[in-house]
């Protein structure tokens, strides 16, 4: 359970980045900001800053005195330990206990507030005032001139500790004017060792004067301490004698040196500039000063070491610039070299390819096919070989190629840096593939030949479409060629010629019946007789190829049937009128069947003709029998069961075509 605290309790408060700090639970004043729930208002001794902390970060002072009450190097910590013991009721309105040239009252002095020190300092001030009253007017003029010159030169001067403090106090007493620097004669009289001592001593009070609230404290909370007023600065001048630290120098801020204003204004300026150093210590706990702090701590810049450091920084910057320029030049040179090498390689590759073409042309063979397949072979060879150094056979024309490559590189560099970077990237990618380029020429030739043959085979396979595809293509060409708007007779004739040369089977024709239909229509194309004749020729070719000798047999049967009908008609005319109507009645169904209504009607007509030929016993009986036997031998499907629907359909199709051809022949005759 965390301890419950009351206002006025002394505690050690723990902040992140700070040790356990001596503090006090503070009262909440009327109108003040109320703390969040479960937090107490804390007043830190030494820094006189406030914050809100929870009970888990607070530890009773009496219990933890031995544990956390040890001296620490942190600014204000030791002063806080002294305050919590000797002045536990201190508030942020009281001056801090640290002794420095900017402390506000002599009452808060830590180890230097004795009466003996005050007496000594007062005597010192009295003697100095007596000496310096006579020379104040002269010094004012000389010092003001020196201040102006120092401002123009940009150097902040520092004086010995005792001289500056005495002259400051004398001037404050006489004319209330503060001069930040002493005349050059006094500065030149100093030895470099003394200036180094004073510069070292200037930093000692800054380490000790950590009790100022504007500076770094344990928490950047509410800062109650404000900039001291003019009356406080006057009291400071009188209280400076009560301090035993003789290492107090004139404030080196540029405001005091340039304007030569009063001591109160100079001190207030310094105090205004110092708060940024401890603005938010919670965010930056390290004790190092901020970036703004080094401005007032710069007075030793008059020494040659500071000027050397400034010049050294300038030299470093110039060196960095030079290095950057050198790197850029090196990169540009590398890019140019890479471009030249790339161009050389491309030239060499082109020459090699030209030589190979010549060799191929000399050797003979399918030169046209090789030329067609050259471009893909080029790409593959480039990828496989990489971009290594040129071989021994290609090393002779390097001089000429180098000149050409330089010219091309200059041209390629004009568009911009992007064109220069790309070949560099290609070069880097191609470097690991340098070795494969050393292959013998014969191996590459054989490999390319094999690749060319494989490509030729693939091309042949692709170029050879199926018969069905060609048939469909020719069919579409014929249709387009015989448009009503713009007929193309030549194209139609060429397509019909090619169609007649196709090796068409019955299966293909069954799938593409529309081709046969178009051929039938074109046979009656009255616009051009050549097209009609060609279509009839192609139609008969297709029939002869598909049906074979069966067509001839059917034609013979049809001719025999026609002759028989004629003979019968003659007999009927000769016979008496009674028998004629019977025979005519018998012949009526046959004539009705012979009408080409569908494929079945044509097939039935053909069958009736065959039956009649067999009954008469004429010489033409051998024809249909032979045709049927050949039909059985030619088509494997005829050997299968005739009861199947597929076989019946094929038979009907064939008989239909045969009967139509026979009818056409009869019509022509």
Curated annotation (Swiss-Prot):
Membrane-crossing segments per the record: none
Region ranges (Interaction with DPF3/BAF45C isoform 2): 466-548
Biased composition (Low complexity): 127-137, 252-269
Record's signal peptide: none
Coiled-coil region(s): 550-575
UniProt KW Cytoplasm keyword: yes
PANTHER family attached to this UniProt entry: HEPATOMA-DERIVED GROWTH FACTOR-RELATED (PTHR12550), HEPATOMA-DERIVED GROWTH FACTOR-RELATED PROTEIN 2 (PTHR12550:SF18)
UniProt name for this protein: Hepatoma-derived growth factor-related protein 2
């Amino acid at each position: 359970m965390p301890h419950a605290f009351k206002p006025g309790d002394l505690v050690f408060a723990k902040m992140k980045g700070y040790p356990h700090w001596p503090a006090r639970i503070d009262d909440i004043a009327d109108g003040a900001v109320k703390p969040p729930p479960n937090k107490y208002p804390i007043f830190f001794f030494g820094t006189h800053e406030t914050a809100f902390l929870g009970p888990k970060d607070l530890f009773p002072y009496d219990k933890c005195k031995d544990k956390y009450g040890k001296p620490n190097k942190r600014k204000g910590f030791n002063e806080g330990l002294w305050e919590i013991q000797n002045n536990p009721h201190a508030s942020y309105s009281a001056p801090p206990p640290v002794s420095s040239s900017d402390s506000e009252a002599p009452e808060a002095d830590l180890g230097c507030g004795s009466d003996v020190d005050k007496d000594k300092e007062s005597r010192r001030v009295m003697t100095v005032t007596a000496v310096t009253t006579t020379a104040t007017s002269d010094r004012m003029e000389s010092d003001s001139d020196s201040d102006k010159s120092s401002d123009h030169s940009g150097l902040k001067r520092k004086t010995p500790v005792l001289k500056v403090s005495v002259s400051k106090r004398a001037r404050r007493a006489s004319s209330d004017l503060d001069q930040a620097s002493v005349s050059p004669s006094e500065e030149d009289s100093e030895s470099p060792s003394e200036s180094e001592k004073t510069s070292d001593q200037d930093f000692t009070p800054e380490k000790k004067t950590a009790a100022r609230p504007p500076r770094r404290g344990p928490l950047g909370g509410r800062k109650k301490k404000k900039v001291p007023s003019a009356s406080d600065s006057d009291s400071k001048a009188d209280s400076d004698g009560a301090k035993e630290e003789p290492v107090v120098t004139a404030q080196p801020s540029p405001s005091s040196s340039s304007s030569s204003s009063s001591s109160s204004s100079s001190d207030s300026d310094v105090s205004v500039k110092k708060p940024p150093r401890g603005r938010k210590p919670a965010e930056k706990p390290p004790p190092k000063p901020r970036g703004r702090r080094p401005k007032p701590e710069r007075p030793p810049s008059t020494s040659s070491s500071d000027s050397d450091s400034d010049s050294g920084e300038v030299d470093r910057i110039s060196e960095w610039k030079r290095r950057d320029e050198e790197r850029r030049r090196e990169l540009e040179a590398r890019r140019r070299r890479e471009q030249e090498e790339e161009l050389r390689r491309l030239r060499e590759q082109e020459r090699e390819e030209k030589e190979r073409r010549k060799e191929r042309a000399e050797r003979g063979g399918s030169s046209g096919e090789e030329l067609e397949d050259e471009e893909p072979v080029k790409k593959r060879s480039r990828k496989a070989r990489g971009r290594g150094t040129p071989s021994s056979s290609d090393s002779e024309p390097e001089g000429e190629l180098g000149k050409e490559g330089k010219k091309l590189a200059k041209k390629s560099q004009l568009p911009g840096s992007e064109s220069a970077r790309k070949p560099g990237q290609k070069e880097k990618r191609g470097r690991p593939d340098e070795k494969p380029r050393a292959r013998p020429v014969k191996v590459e030739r054989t490999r390319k030949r094999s690749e060319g043959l494989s490509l030729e085979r693939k091309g042949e396979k692709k170029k050879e479409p199926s018969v069905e595809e060609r048939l469909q293509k020719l069919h579409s060409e014929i249709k387009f060629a015989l448009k009503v708007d713009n007929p193309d007779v030549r194209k139609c004739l060429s397509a019909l010629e090619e169609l007649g040369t196709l090796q068409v089977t019955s299966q293909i024709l069954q799938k593409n019946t529309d081709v046969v239909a178009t051929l039938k229509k074109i046979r009656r194309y009255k616009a051009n007789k050549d097209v009609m004749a060609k279509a009839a020729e192609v139609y008969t070719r297709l029939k002869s190829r598909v049906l074979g000798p069966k067509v001839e047999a059917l034609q013979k049967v049809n001719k025999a049937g026609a002759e028989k009908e004629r003979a019968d008609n003659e007999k009927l005319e000769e016979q008496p009128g009674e028998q004629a109507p019977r025979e005519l009645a018998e012949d009526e169904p046959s004539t009705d069947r012979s009408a080409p209504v569908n494929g079945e009607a044509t097939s039935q007509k053909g069958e009736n003709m065959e039956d009649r030929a067999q009954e008469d016993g004429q010489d033409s009986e051998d024809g249909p029998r032979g045709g049927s036997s050949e039909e059985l031998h030619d088509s494997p499907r005829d050997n299968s069961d005739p009861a199947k629907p597929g076989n019946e359909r094929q038979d009907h199709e064939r008989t239909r075509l045969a009967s139509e051809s026979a009818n056409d022949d009869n019509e022509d005759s």
